[in-house]
């Protein structure tokens, strides 16, 4: 089989190509009255957030990683006039709650923009003051204090969640919160129309029209034979089972097991990758709370049963033993955020201390502010590449959240 543009069969194989989104004007459209609806706790300073993100990207390039940007790929994907018009229609259709019947005026506004300007504007959001309206309808006389016709998408720099590379294919995800649901439309168009992907026959294991929610922060590729997926507030058990069935029936895949891991429904445990991330063949960074719960967690191993031509599901509550078994190692080492200290651990977990990006076995990218965790990693033989994230972290995501691997070398 010809090598395609997507290949991710582990969390730790040498990273060759990664998808990022540089923070843009969408962060400047965050206002205190509407923070919670857009899933933010604070407002990052855009200039500094961009500087921090640029240094993150350069750190990856310095390690030989090709960095591609969501906003650039999306603009290139809509170069065809008909595709561009369909993309605009789709965006407006998914923004009906705020568009308020002004599709024609918004389309006139968009017509003046280049492809890149259009993508940037849709991501940033369209303020009402940007659109000229004639007051011919009653709704236009109403004093609607909501400031946007198209909401900004400030979470887009967390490219991990709207899509996920799984083997040689992707999941294009139905996001849990309405504020993020439009985000996966960009990758839908990129796979379908971008020259790099459109003729590559990239399998889509789940698409965004699925009735069940799933987010990439809950999807971990343990090995070429096993996935771990969090059952969380944002990822449903139904989505995990459907994904497993779709993967198992594809003869080109090597995946044989999907480990569904139930995690608490809370912002602290937003996704599985805020609980633990894999950083070496037998090592994981973990939320220190795992040590209290690791033998009481609900784990469900989904496998294909050839005799029954159906899936079978087995239950366990031993996290460490289950991981060791599927990874084929003698034992698993958990490295706790903040060394498990009640103060340091809580502080560094809040600042995404366990959300590390592995760029090859034993080499990770972390926020420099999590100095207790970083020193512990070094003591365990891990090479730590630190980046500054004082503004980036305000979105409550770390280096893994901010990156979507498109290609890793197999291990």
From Swiss-Prot:
Compartment(s): Cytoplasm
One protein family per Pfam: ADI
Sequence similarity: Belongs to the arginine deiminase family.
Main localization of the protein described in the UniProt heading: cytoplasm
Protein name according to UniProt: Arginine deiminase
Active site: 401
GO biological process, one term: arginine deiminase pathway
PANTHER family (UniProt xref): ARGININE DEIMINASE
Keyword Cytoplasm: yes
Catalytic reaction annotation: L-arginine + H2O = L-citrulline + NH4(+)
Keywords: Arginine metabolism, Cytoplasm, Hydrolase
